[in-house]
Amino acid sequence: MLKRTPLYDVYKEYGGKTIDFGGWELPVQFSSIKEEHEAVRTKAGLFDVSHMGEVEVSGKDALSFLQKMMTNDVADLKPGNALYTAMCYPDGGTVDDLLIYQKSESCYLLVINASNIEKDIAWLTEHTEGDVTLTNQSDGISLLAVQGPNAQSVLAKLTECDLSSLKPFTFIDKADVAGRQVLLSRTGYTGEDGFELYCRNEDAVHLFKEILAAGEHEGLVPCGLGARDTLRFEAKLALYGQELTKDITPIEAGIGFAVKHKKDSDFFGKSVLREQKEKGAPRKLVGLEMIEKGIPRHGYAVKKDGVPIGEVTTGTQSPTLKKNIGLALIKTEFSEVGTEVEVEIRKKTVKAKIVRTPFYKRPKQS
């Protein structure tokens, strides 16, 4: 039996087509992936991401515990701020990538990938020591994401909060939006400006409909997982299970900015990650652009002069660039921009070249 979010019945109202996504019945699209992608890049989109996991970590030893478990420097946080981090195994492989919100002096909210909830909680529990309490809140919290250049003007119609003063990776813990209390953060997974709203399950449908109504004249549309994937891919935002796995380190995956190997605390994977940061990693995540016809897909082999050098982690026809592009994890010595390589597509060898990433960067606000 597939799991469903509190918004399941609403999908049908708006024409949502659902798929099995890691055991969840979620909308892959409402209108079309291309239209939804375009709406988020130019106007706004609304996503149901309630399948994500939420774990509260509290207690006087919460900070020292998180410093031991996470690659980023959690001591940099203060209440009302969030950061992106990885959690690693001793060999540097990735347990998960996640967001940490500091709610108060000794209380943090971890937002983890849906497919990793049980694994992450088991890993955290195994290493808990001192005054630390872990509370799995995943089943009681729904999560909506409003993303795109018009996201702020849409939400401004529903709240008295001063959204313009909310900087990226900051949040308001008990914000009133459309008459409901939410944790409202300026975060997202699309490469655009945007907000995420963590709410009680019973408030999810009300908020979803209120946001859609508020965005009616702003070009906001409901969006599915298909557009979420093409948007994050163009912005080179890693997806666990593709760019990050237990066999791929955060350095290899290009998120070295979330690894603070000089922080005082020891953490899982520190020695391996420090060495990769200082001396370079054996593999590197690069951008591919096809020279010949063909779309690079997850798992396709990448070769240089017929010799395997890595594989594609994500690939598609980019809705924004109108090109066939991919991300690939390859041997570092072949990662220079401009290098020609081959991708094996349906037993045929197809030419591609290494290009700069991210493929898409949000235009600066004038």
Curated annotation (Swiss-Prot):
It catalyses: N(6)-[(R)-S(8)-aminomethyldihydrolipoyl]-L-lysyl-[protein] + (6S)-5,6,7,8-tetrahydrofolate = N(6)-[(R)-dihydrolipoyl]-L-lysyl-[protein] + (6R)-5,10-methylene-5,6,7,8-tetrahydrofolate + NH4(+). It comes from the Bacteria. It is an enzyme of class 2 (transferase). One of its GO terms (cellular component) is glycine cleavage complex. GO terms for molecular function: aminomethyltransferase activity; transaminase activity. The keyword Transferase applies. Its EC number is 2.1.2.10. Keywords: Aminotransferase, Transferase. GO terms for biological process: glycine decarboxylation via glycine cleavage system. InterPro entries: GCS_T, GCS_T_bac, GCST_C, GCV_T_N, GcvT/YgfZ/DmdA, GcvT/YgfZ_C, TrmE/GcvT_dom1. NCBIfam families: gcvT, PRK00389.1. The glycine cleavage system catalyzes the degradation of glycine. HAMAP family: GcvT (MF_00259). The glycine cleavage system is composed of four proteins: P, T, L and H. Belongs to the GcvT family. This is Aminomethyltransferase. The lineage of its organism: Bacteria, Bacillati, Bacillota, Bacilli, Bacillales.
